[in-house]
């Protein structure tokens, strides 16, 4: 049995969050809807493998996402860093004790993002 993964972020910052993930990870809109009481977007990676999706859902409450991190494995972390605009706040890359290299970002909602190379 095959699975894919979809993670949902509910936020009052729908447009800003959608634009952030499209800009940083070159994601594409897989689905988008906008009705009076239901608004959101599902983003996918451009490669079309459909193994992971990110749903950004419009909500009135700004949630506390402390303790949550979204982790993206990069084939070449140095090349990824070079694609980032200078205004993107970041920390690293940092070598971790197990040999992987981590770059730390934070999305508009305070969700911790780790982009890493090496390991699983």
Tell me what each language-model feature is.
Residues 6, 25, 114:
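Short catalytic micro-motifs in class I SAM-dependent methyltransferases
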Residues 13-15, 70-112, 120:
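Vicinal oxygen chelate
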Residues 13-29:
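Amphipathic alpha-helical segments
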Residues 28-65, 112-118:
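Conserved short beta-strand elements that form part of the metal-binding/catalytic scaffold
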């Amino acid at each position: 049995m095959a699975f894919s993964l979809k993670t949902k972020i509910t936020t009052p910052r729908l447009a800003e969050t959608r634009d952030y993930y499209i800009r940083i990870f070159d994601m594409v809109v897989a689905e988008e809807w906008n009705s009076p009481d239901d608004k959101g977007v599902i983003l996918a990676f451009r490669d079309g493998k459909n193994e992971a999706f990110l749903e950004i859902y419009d909500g009135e409450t700004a949630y506390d996402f402390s303790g949550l991190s979204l982790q993206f494995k990069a084939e070449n972390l140095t090349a990824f860093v070079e694609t980032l605009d200078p205004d993107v706040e970041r920390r690293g890359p940092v070598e971790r004790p197990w040999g992987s290299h981590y770059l730390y970002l934070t999305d508009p909602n305070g969700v911790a993002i780790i982009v890493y190379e090496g390991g699983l």
